Curated annotation (Swiss-Prot):
Pfam families: SLX9. It comes from Kluyveromyces lactis (strain ATCC 8585 / CBS 2359 / DSM 70799 / NBRC 1267 / NRRL Y-1140 / WM37) (Yeast). Keywords: Nucleus, Ribosome biogenesis, rRNA processing. GO terms for cellular component: 90S preribosome; nucleolus; preribosome, small subunit precursor. Interacts with the 35S, 23S and 20S pre-rRNAs and with the U3 snoRNA. Belongs to the SLX9 family. One of its GO terms (biological process) is maturation of SSU-rRNA from tricistronic rRNA transcript (SSU-rRNA, 5.8S rRNA, LSU-rRNA). Its main location: nucleus. This is Ribosome biogenesis protein SLX9. Residues 28-49, 137-163 are annotated as: Disordered. It is found in: Nucleus, Nucleolus. Involved in ribosome biogenesis. Required for normal pre-rRNA processing in internal transcribed spacer 1 (ITS1). May be involved in the movements of the replication forks. The gene is SLX9.
Length: 198
């Protein structure tokens, strides 16, 4: 009998505790709906992620954009070369039409330009003009030895020579900026300098 009573008491106690637990849990489950529930974006499933990735990859492969992605480098080079070759005649036509319209003057100096240069040379204080060997090498009349440096010219391959060349270039740059012809018309001065070097 005693054992029977003990189990009965235990079951009664267990029932009471479970009922109390159920009453305690019920108010927690009956909370009002969360006001921020709709602010969270729906999560992507793994399947959707894989589909999106594959779609992006396929579209990248099939769609060749303006930057020519997805094409081999040699093919891109060939296409660019073809476009350049097609553009050259168009640029020549543009140059001819601009010269005909009078927007760009021809490279030959006109009579007015020759007269202005002659007058400037008469007014200058220089009495005798001597062409140097360096000028001849620029014009192409003097023989040029490729790979041979002048003895007094600084060598760009070592640090001291590179520094000296940088100083010379900065000095020459300032002289060009202070030049009156460059200040009046910089593009004509650049054209003339390029013409002298060819």
């Amino acid at each position: 009998m005693v054992a029977k009573k003990r189990t009965a008491l235990r079951t009664k106690a267990a029932k009471v505790t479970t009922v109390e637990k159920d009453h305690a849990v019920q108010p927690l489950t009956e909370l009002p709906p969360d006001p921020k529930a709709f602010l969270h974006q729906p999560r992507e499933t793994k399947k959707e992620k894989l589909q999106n990735k594959s779609q992006n990859f396929i579209s990248r492969i099939t769609d060749v954009g303006k930057n020519l992605t997805g094409i081999s480098k040699s093919s891109v080079r060939r296409r660019k070369r073809k476009l350049r070759d097609e553009l050259k005649p168009k640029m020549d036509d543009l140059l001819i039409s601009l010269q005909q319209e009078g927007v760009i003057r021809n490279d030959e100096p006109s009579q007015e330009d020759l007269a202005v240069e002659k007058k400037a040379s008469l007014n200058s204080s220089v009495t005798k003009v001597i062409t140097s060997d360096a000028y001849g090498s620029i014009r192409g009349s003097a023989p040029q030895h490729k790979g041979q440096l002048r003895k007094n010219e600084p060598n760009i391959r070592n640090q001291r020579g590179a520094k000296a060349l940088a100083q010379q270039e900065s000095k020459r740059f300032n002289e060009v900026l202070l030049n009156e012809t460059f200040q009046k018309n910089p593009f004509d001065a650049l054209k003339e300098a390029i013409r002298m070097r060819q």
